[in-house]
A protein has these predicted regions:
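An N-terminal assembly and electron-transfer interface module characteristic of large anaerobic redox
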Residues: 1-456
């Protein structure tokens, strides 16, 4: 059975390479694995080879989140010719979905004839998980598709082995293979011991295991507990280790939709003994309560308003090596700027600092791929820890002793541009800020807009 994987998942590339070698021994001549790490454009020869490998595959998994447009176009040229099973992950090429009797065509609305939305597909998959166990044909194929997507999203070596075995058993004619185990998936939210990536759900047990200390502030560290598209655990642990000397850290691994784990997240952040947290770091891209498929942003904003504490957003460069990042003038790609800086800012995030980037592992000549891993940028991790320590110290300082600068526009220098702002009455805004500072106990003087003009 020929498998072709076109993916942006770094862990999948690594583990599939290892599994290919194992399967050649365990199932000689029965499994052929072709891989393409689709994070950048390929040379013409490799692009043509990819198209042919897609067209001739018995099973194609397509995962093109953020892939270059030319790669996407080439993949779809191959899919147009493919007669095998096609498994799109996420929104990638959903119109080509085909697994046994289950296909995108069979799910199209009779009136609209459009490809089903991600929400529709999710509902049908959930239904098929139950019915597929007892009903043959299309329902079984729907259930299998749901399982295969879970195997891939949580791309451990065990899950990817089960992915291959399920396909070979149910679609490759190898019925002697035992039914693979269910996908090993993390909880929607849990407290993690980052030393061994084990997790607990009870706050008391976690505090005891992590040796929380009375009198220290508590800090929440949110991260993605699944390994798609990269395994961030090494970088998250580096942040955790840098914070632990001066605060109690709640390492909260999240997976799934925010609305599913919001109640439990609130209970952790507002724990009666160790909460409420004094500061939150969120290492996940996009917005707190919304991802690439959307969400309910107002839920995230409501939670952050309730906490009323600093909200920091360290992030990971998953498409650049550390060397590329150091040499780059811009630092971040446009897509990284959008999902890791602009969108978090809409939730009120501050200090969007890159703390990790990719490093290249030994080249895999057999599959012609360059495996990569995410690794911490030590200097930036230390900078984040320093910022956190200073924010925590600032929370303990009386307002009357705090020093604040208010910087207003004056460019090019001149009276006409002083406090400039298109369609804004900046003097009134600054006046109101000063009044609020006085009310909150800061050592300053409330000035009217007219008095501000006189001062400057």
């Amino acid at each position: 059975m020929k498998f072709t994987f076109v993916v942006v998942s770094a862990p999948a590339v690594q583990y599939l390479s290892e599994l290919d070698e194992e399967f050649q021994t365990q199932f000689p001549g029965c499994a052929e694995i072709k891989m393409y790490y689709a994070v950048e454009e390929f040379p013409a020869e490799k692009t043509n080879r990819m198209i042919e490998d897609i067209a001739s595959a018995d099973c194609v998994l397509v995962d093109l989140m953020g892939s270059p447009p030319r790669v996407v176009q080439a993949v779809e040229r191959g899919l147009d010719r493919c007669q095998g099973n096609v498994l799109p992950y996420g929104a990638s090429s959903r119109q080509y979905l085909r697994l046994g009797k289950f296909s995108a065509d069979s799910m199209k609305g009779k009136s609209s004839g459009t490809t089903p939305s991600m929400e529709t597909m999710k509902k049908m998959q959930d239904m098929a998980k139950t019915l597929g166990k007892i009903m043959p044909g299309k329902m079984r194929d729907m259930r299998n598709y749901s399982l295969l997507m879970q195997y891939f999203q949580h791309a451990s070596k065990e899950n990817l082995r089960s992915f291959l075995l399920l396909m070979m058993r149910d679609y490759g004619g190898m019925r002697s293979i035992k039914e693979p185990p269910a996908p090993k998936m993390p909880k929607s939210i849990a407290l993690f011991d980052l030393a061994d990536m084990s997790y607990v759900e009870d706050m008391g047990a976690y505090a005891a295991k992590q040796q929380f200390r009375k009198g220290l502030p508590s800090v929440a560290l949110l991260f993605s507990s699944h390994a798609y598209p990269t395994d961030t655990s090494v970088c998250v642990k580096a942040i955790y280790d840098a914070l632990k000397p001066f605060c109690n850290v709640l390492a909260l691994g999240c997976s799934g939709s925010f609305w599913e784990y919001e109640p439990k997240l609130k209970s952790y952040l507002n724990h009666p003994e160790w909460g409420p947290v004094s500061l939150t770091l969120n290492c996940m891209p996009f917005r707190l309560a919304a991802g690439p498929m959307g969400g309910k942003t107002e839920l995230g904003i409501s939670l952050l308003q309730e906490l009323d504490s600093p909200y920091l957003h360290p992030f990971f460069l998953t498409r650049r090596t550390q060397e590329d990042w150091l040499e780059s003038v811009s630092g971040c790609t446009p897509s990284e700027t959008l999902i890791s800086i602009m969108l978090p800012e809409m939730d009120g995030a501050i200090d969007m600092i890159p703390v990790g980037a990719m490093i290249q592992k030994p080249y895999d000549a057999v599959h012609d791929v360059q495996p990569c891993d995410l690794a911490p940028i030590d200097e930036r991790v230390e900078r984040v820890a320093m910022r956190v320590q200073r924010y925590l110290a600032l929370k303990q300082k009386p307002n009357k002793d705090k020093k604040i600068s208010i910087i207003c526009y004056n460019y090019p220098p001149g009276e006409a541009n002083l406090f400039g702002g298109a369609f804004l009455d900046t003097f009134v805004s600054v006046s109101q800020i000063l009044q609020r500072l006085v009310q909150e106990g800061y050592t300053t003087k409330a000035l009217t807009p007219e008095e501000l003009r006189e001062v400057f």
